[in-house]
Amino acid sequence: MSAGGAGGEAKGGYPPQTIMALGIVGGLVGIYLGNFAPPAYSFFGGLGAICATVWGADAVRRVASYGLGTGVPSIGMLALGMGILAALFGLSVGGTAGPIVAIVVAAIIGGVIGALANKVIGMGIPIMEKAMVEISCAGTLVILGLSVVIAGSFDFASVVQYVVANGYIALIFIIGGMGILHPFNASLGPDEKQDRTLMLAVEKGAIALIIAGFASSLHEGLMAAGLNMLIGIIIWYVAFSKHYALIKRDAYAVVGSGMLPSSEELQ
């Protein structure tokens, strides 16, 4: 991560504690419902992943507002890297309590990395340690939620077989990381608004659910996969429509660019 220009504390209508509660409670409830419900309802894991994505995107927004520069994409990938380690460790030793163990481990990893970033690298961001804890935990919940969508449960053996061994973990890494890093990266600037940024996070989380739903077809069958994708498409459409409305609210003008001029017209 590289430091960008000078920045400051991000402002927004939704307090961090509220969004954190949404991410933790919504994420865990979705993951556990997806685990214990029949495979046709594994989309609950995706709903939990969306809640965690919103939490992670807000944490990125708050820490990146201090001036991360090109570190905005990097911190999103870092979140999922920490998330994979914490999620697999938690599931391997925690059994039914695996997701909770994973969050605790993620918080420890995030705290250590945040302290190194501030104390050793010298980034000097006041909320770095706290933000890295949040981002690490959010990334872990995203990994767990999307794994439940694909595998139908968070049983360690099932996740290893249906998510890790076949390479879908790399897919989750990319789509989950994009959901956390992209919203602020696409919205940053003096006119950035919290609600618009977080609505984009919902949209990206829904796309992740659609893709994970498609991947689940190899294990859960076409009916369950179709339901996963349908839920994702509905959420995506609603979030996209709302995000576009927020863009029009904040933009000075929305105009059509028309066709690109021909070479003759440019002469």
Swiss-Prot record:
Subcellular location(s) per record: Cell membrane
Name this polypeptide is given: Tetrahydromethanopterin S-methyltransferase subunit C
UniProt similarity note: Belongs to the MtrC family.
GO cellular component: plasma membrane
Keywords annotated in UniProt: Cell membrane, Membrane, Methanogenesis, Methyltransferase, One-carbon metabolism, Transferase, Translocase, Transmembrane, Transmembrane helix
Record EC number: 7.2.1.4
InterPro entries on file: THM_MeTrfase_su_C
Presence of the UniProt keyword Methyltransferase in the record: yes
Enzyme class: translocase
Pathway where it operates: One-carbon metabolism; methanogenesis from CO(2); methyl-coenzyme M from 5,10-methylene-5,6,7,8-tetrahydromethanopterin: step 2/2
Chain ranges passing through the membrane: 19-39, 75-95, 97-117, 140-160, 162-182, 198-218, 221-241
Pfam annotation, one family: MtrC
Membrane topology category: Multi-pass membrane protein
Catalytic activity: 5-methyl-5,6,7,8-tetrahydromethanopterin + coenzyme M + 2 Na(+)(in) = 5,6,7,8-tetrahydromethanopterin + methyl-coenzyme M + 2 Na(+)(out)
Assembly and interaction partners: The complex is composed of 8 subunits; MtrA, MtrB, MtrC, MtrD, MtrE, MtrF, MtrG and MtrH.
A single BP term in Gene Ontology: methanogenesis, from carbon dioxide
